[in-house]
Amino acid sequence: MASADEKVVEEKASVISSLLDKAKGFFAEKLANIPTPEATVDDVDFKGVTRDGVDYHAKVSVKNPYSQSIPICQISYILKSATRTIASGTIPDPGSLVGSGTTVLDVPVKVAYSIAVSLMKDMCTDWDIDYQLDIGLTFDIPVVGDITIPVSTQGEIKLPSLRDFF
């Protein structure tokens, strides 16, 4: 009698396991097809010189596919030249994306003077540096949760000259 009960329990466990696997597959497929915001880096420009360092600003366009606004949890960035990280940081809670539209985010990047001077020594011939900017935009999408969209761009940044200081 115990072996018959064990068979019934095993059959029920098998059916439940099969249903759970089907449910996981269904939800994974549905979540994979959920639209997410799309982002592109439009421009990276020299902004100015302060007492703390050299300021650059990246303009990032983010398209929201939803009719409701989506909160941005944080923006993280890493600015590299060659293989060396020259600036990194995080901007907590920078605002929200407008519903069914494109939001342009301004990502300020500050390069310390010590790093800028060493870059000037390395790049004194053409007064610009080749860079790679990696940005991670973290959004809080209802039902799905927090997602991070990586955006990367490469190009050249103008180094400040003496006329930028005066």
From Swiss-Prot:
Superkingdom classification of source: Eukaryota
Cited Pfam families: LEA_2 (PF03168)
Residue spans crossing the bilayer: none
InterPro entries named in the record: Lea14-like, LEA_2, WHy-dom
SUPFAM superfamilies to which the protein is assigned, alphabetical: LEA14-like (SSF117070)
BP GO terms, sorted: response to desiccation
GO annotations of cellular component type: cytosol; plasma membrane
Family of this protein: Belongs to the LEA type 2 family.
Entry protein name: Desiccation-related protein At2g46140
Naturally occurring in which organism (per UniProt): Arabidopsis thaliana (Mouse-ear cress)
